[in-house]
């Protein structure tokens, strides 16, 4: 019985990682914001230079680059897979991972948590790339 439970947990792990889609995430953030996503606002936020966050990460493009279909690079030199789902199909399919990274990166770049509307806008733009 114990072996069965362990095997079930191991087999369920990968299925749980892909618990969502970009469209589902956007819909959830739109509902929380009470407004539809705007991809153009997401593009503008992604490409803009911010002043509220860390000085060494003034923009999303600092690490991800302006072309989100290409790999980016962390400040330590580690490669970051492309943000665009067209280049990285499993991007934005794990809701916990999306929340973790949006939380970390919004605070690093903007100096605060992104609002649900900003998250919807960013994902709407990224999903279209």
Curated annotation (Swiss-Prot):
Residues where heme c binds = 60, 63-64
Signal peptide as annotated in the record: 1-17
Q: Which InterPro entries match?
A: Cyt_c-like_dom (IPR009056), Cyt_c-like_dom_sf (IPR036909), DUF1924_SHP (IPR015170)
- Report TM segments: none
Q: Does the keyword Signal apply?
A: yes
Xref: PROSITE patterns: CYTC
- S-S bonds: 106-114
A molecular function (GO) term: heme binding
Listed A to Z, the keywords are: Disulfide bond, Electron transport, Heme, Iron, Metal-binding, Signal, Transport
After translation, the protein is modified as follows:
Binds 1 heme c group covalently per subunit.
Function statement: High-spin cytochrome. Transiently bind oxygen during autoxidation, which occurs with a half-life of 3 minutes with a 4-fold excess of O(2). Also binds carbon monoxide, azide and cyanide.
Name this protein carries in UniProt: Cytochrome c-type protein SHP
Question: Which source organism does the UniProt entry give?
Answer: Cereibacter sphaeroides (strain ATCC 17023 / DSM 158 / JCM 6121 / CCUG 31486 / LMG 2827 / NBRC 12203 / NCIMB 8253 / ATH 2.4.1.) (Rhodobacter sphaeroides)
């Amino acid at each position: 019985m114990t072996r069965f439970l362990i095997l079930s947990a191991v087999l369920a792990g990968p299925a749980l990682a892909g618990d969502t889609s970009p469209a589902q995430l956007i819909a959830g953030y739109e509902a929380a914001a009470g407004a539809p996503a705007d991809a153009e606002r997401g593009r503008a936020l992604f490409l803009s230079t911010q002043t509220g966050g860390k000085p060494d990460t003034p923009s999303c493009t600092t690490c991800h680059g302006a072309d989100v279909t290409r790999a980016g690079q962390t400040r330590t030199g580690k490669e970051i897979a492309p943000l665009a789902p067209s280049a990285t199909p499993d991007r934005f399919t794990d809701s916990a991972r999306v929340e973790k990274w949006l939380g970390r990166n919004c605070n690093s770049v903007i100096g605060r948590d992104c609002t649900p509307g900003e998250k919807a806008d960013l994902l709407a733009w990224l999903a279209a790339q």
